[in-house]
C-alpha cells in the first residue's frame, strides 16, 4: 500500500520533525519505506530519513507493508500535515 505525499513544512523534514516522524513509524508492525528520486529509505531510521533530503516541496512515496499498513500511512500523512500547522502557529 502506498501514498504520495509532499513535504509542506517550509524548513523541510529537519532533525526535530524527522525524529517525530521516525518515532511514529516505529510504532507500527508494518514496514514503512520512503521512496524518493529512485532511492528507498527506511521510515524507522533517523539516518535514512535525514539522508532522504526531504526539503519543503519534496515529493515522496510512503510505501507500507504489513497488517497495519493503512493505519501507518494515515498517521504518517497526518503527522506531515501537522508539521505545517505547527509552523504556522
Describe each PLM feature range.
Residues 53-89:
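C-terminal structural segments of small proteins and small subunits
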Residues 1-2:
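Absolute protein N-terminus
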Residues 6-52, 56:
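Compact, glycine-rich, soluble single-domain proteins
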Amino acid at each position: 500500500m502506498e501514498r504520495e505525499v509532499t513535504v509542506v513544512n517550509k524548513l523541510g523534514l529537519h532533525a526535530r520533525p524527522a525524529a517525530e516522524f521516525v518515532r511514529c513509524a516505529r510504532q507500527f508492525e508494518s514496514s514503512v519505506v520512503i521512496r524518493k528520486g529512485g532511492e528507498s529509505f527506511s521510515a524507522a531510521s533517523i539516518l535514512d530519513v535525514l539522508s532522504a533530503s526531504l526539503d519543503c516541496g519534496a515529493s515522496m512515496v510512503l510505501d507500507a507493508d504489513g497488517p497495519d499498513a493503512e493505519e501507518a500511512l494515515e498517521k504518517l500523512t497526518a503527522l506531515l500535515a501537522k508539521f505545517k500547522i505547527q509552523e504556522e502557529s
